[in-house]
């Protein structure tokens, strides 16, 4: 029997082979990203668009991403917000989140200058995880 595991890990879109990796890199609307890159993106947003002393995104744009939209006060520009503390009670009101399919989350927590990345978290475990993470960030 021929071993096709690696051949089957790719799909062809047009004339290009694209990885289709079960169990790890899909996030949100088809974004393929590692946990490390998720953290880097979160850090870029925590740092108001700066990286390595340069602005990669305008700071005003990043701030606007965290402003609630009129029809959904818990949502900004591709960011979930926690202003009233109801979405994620364990997080600060300044926290924002990028949430993806399968429990993938990038939690941007300015109150502790922290970015927390979670992958494949069962939604029933989210609040407990966040309580423990916030306690660890507080040093207790």
Language-model features, listed with the residues they occupy:
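Active-site-proximal helix/loop microenvironment
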Residues: 1-47
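Active-site Gly/Thr loop motif
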Residues: 6-25, 63-115
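Active-site-proximal alpha-helical segments within enzyme catalytic domains
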Residues: 29-50, 104-120
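Acidic-and-aromatic substrate-binding clefts and catalytic sites of carbohydrate-active enzymes
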Residues: 32, 87, 124
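Extracytoplasmic/secreted proteins, especially bacterial periplasmic and envelope-associated proteins
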Residues: 36-40, 60, 128, 132
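Structured segments of extracytoplasmic/periplasmic soluble domains
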Residues: 44-48, 68, 136
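Structural helix-adjacent loops and short alpha-helical linkers that scaffold large soluble proteins
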Residues: 49-57
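Structured C-terminal helix/loop/strand segments within mature extracytoplasmic catalytic/sensor domains
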Residues: 97-140
């Amino acid at each position: 029997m021929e071993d096709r595991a690696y051949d089957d890990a790719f799909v062809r879109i047009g004339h290009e082979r694209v990885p289709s990796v079960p169990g790890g890199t899909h996030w949100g609307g088809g974004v393929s990203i590692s946990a490390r890159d998720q953290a880097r993106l979160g850090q870029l947003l925590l740092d108001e668009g700066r990286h390595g002393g340069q602005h990669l995104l305008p700071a005003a744009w990043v701030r606007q991403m965290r402003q609630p939209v009129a029809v959904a006060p818990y949502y900004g520009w591709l960011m979930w917000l926690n202003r009233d503390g109801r979405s994620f009670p364990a997080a600060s009101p300044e926290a924002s989140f990028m949430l993806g399919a399968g429990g993938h989350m990038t939690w941007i927590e300015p109150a502790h200058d922290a970015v927390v990345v979670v992958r494949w978290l069962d939604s029933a475990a989210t609040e407990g995880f966040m309580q423990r993470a916030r306690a660890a960030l507080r040093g207790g």
